[in-house]
C-alpha cells in the first residue's frame, strides 16, 4: 500500500493512511505544551516523537531549571532574552537530562518556526524531521528562518508546515 503508514505493536496493527492526521495531533500536543510557558508575549511549545510514535521529550520557552520565573524578568525584554531557553532547545536539554536519544526523531514546534540557533541543536542531536505550524514568519525572525532553511536543507533535515485544522 503505497503512501500508507503502518503502526504496529504486539496487540494490534493500525493502518494510517493520512499521515497529516498524526502531524496535526502532535502539533496539537506541542500547542498544549506551549501553554506551560509563563512568557506573556511568546508561548512556544515543542515535542520530539520517536519512530514508533512515542513521546521522547517536550519543551517550552522558559528559564533554565532553578531560575525563578519572576514576572519582572519576563517584562524586561533584554533580561528575558538573556535568560530564556527556546522550546526546541528545551526538548534537547530535557532529553539529555533524562538520558533519551533524539537521533532519528521528528520535532513538532508550535508558535514560531525554528530559529537558526535552535536549528544547530536540532542538527547536532540527529533529529531528522521538523514539522511547524503553518503561519507567516514575523519580520524580525525572517533572516534567522532563512538561515534555518539553508542549514536544514544542507544537513538533510526534512521540514514542513502543518495547519491546525
Question: Model regions: which residues?
Answer:
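Zinc-dependent deaminase catalytic domain
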Residues: 1-165
Amino acid at each position: 500500500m503505497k503512501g500508507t503508514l503502518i503502526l504496529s505493536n504486539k496487540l494490534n496493527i493500525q493502518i494510517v493512511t493520512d499521515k497529516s492526521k498524526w502531524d496535526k495531533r502532535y502539533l496539537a500536543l506541542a500547542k498544549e505544551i506551549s501553554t506551560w510557558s509563563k512568557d506573556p508575549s511568546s508561548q512556544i511549545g515543542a515535542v520530539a516523537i520517536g519512530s514508533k510514535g512515542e513521546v521522547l521529550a517536550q519543551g517550552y520557552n522558559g528559564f533554565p531549571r532553578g531560575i525563578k520565573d519572576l514576572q519582572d524578568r519576563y517584562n524586561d525584554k533584554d533580561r528575558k532574552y538573556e535568560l530564556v531557553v527556546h522550546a526546541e532547545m528545551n526538548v534537547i536539554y530535557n532529553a539529555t537530562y533524562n538520558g533519551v536519544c533524539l537521533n532519528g526523531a521528528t520535532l513538532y514546534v508550535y508558535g514560531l518556526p525554528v530559529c537558526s540557533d535552535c536549528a544547530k541543536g536540532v542538527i547536532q542531536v540527529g533529529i531528522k524531521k521538523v514539522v511547524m505550524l503553518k503561519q507567516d514568519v514575523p519580520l524580525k525572525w525572517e533572516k534567522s528562518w532563512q538561515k534555518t532553511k539553508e542549514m536544514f536543507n544542507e544537513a538533510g533535515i526534512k521540514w514542513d508546515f502543518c495547519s491546525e485544522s
